[in-house]
Amino acid sequence: MEIQSQPTNLTKEDVIKLIAEFQQNQCGEAQERLVDHYKNLVYSIAYRYSKGGPMHEDIIQVGMLGLLGAIRRYDYSIGNAFEPFAIPTIVGEIKKYLRDKTWGIHVPRRIKDLGGKIKLAIEELTDHLQRSPKIIEIADHLGLSEEEVLEIMDAKNNYRVSSLDDVVENASDGSSVARIESVGEVEQGYEQTERRLVLKDIFNVLNETEKSVIHYIFEENLNQKDTGERLGISQMHVSRIKRQAISKLKQAAFLDT
């Protein structure tokens, strides 16, 4: 097929153009090129959760569904890179699948109901903001206090599997019961935690300046001008560093399979 002869090494501009083509015209070729370009990223993320076990192929398929969802939902008009939106979307689909497959204990109705609303709010706000929402934004969206949101997220964490490695190991011998225990402090939204989980190993490829630029732009949501002022460099320099850092992260993710 002609589509297979297309190069997979796409620039940021190529990616945005293909996403726009797919969203506007439902172009199958554009979608195939995007999937071909990002399939190694999906494989890398999937392996972090499957460790090559019996669920590996299923997790890859779920990750691909997450990628397709990210392609459909990404707002290219904002101009942010696609990867910081796609990674938590893919991870979220995989973790939801694993929770649904392995969560075999009773969860109080209030936690289940409000936990579901919080999860939906995070997804809606991520689509709207094109970044992970803060606790106060989730609370405002649901008409709750920050304390209530934190309470529900913390309570829900006490019912979640403590390690996804345990889930996969149990699944390999047919068991559906995973080890349950309390898991640490609540982050500012599930998606930030998931993004850090995926990026923690590959983030070390960046130097300190690159790490700072990525932190200010994607975690603190500063624009390039304000980021430059924080670091004492020009806006143009920030733009160059951001492109370089994202390129390094993509290469590290694609090679870590």
Curated annotation (Swiss-Prot):
GO terms for biological process: DNA-templated transcription initiation. It comes from the Bacteria. PROSITE patterns: SIGMA70_1. Keywords: DNA-binding, Sigma factor, Transcription, Transcription regulation. One of its GO terms (molecular function) is DNA binding. A motif (Polymerase core binding) lies at residues 58-71. InterPro entries: RNA_pol_sigma-70_dom, RNA_pol_sigma-B, RNA_pol_sigma-B/F/G, RNA_pol_sigma70, RNA_pol_sigma70_r2, RNA_pol_sigma70_r3, RNA_pol_sigma70_r4, RNA_pol_sigma_r2. Residues 224-243 bind DNA. Sigma factors are initiation factors that promote the attachment of RNA polymerase to specific initiation sites and are then released. Belongs to the sigma-70 factor family. SigB subfamily. PANTHER family: RNA POLYMERASE SIGMA-E FACTOR, SIGMA FACTOR F FLAGELLAR. This is RNA polymerase sigma-B factor.
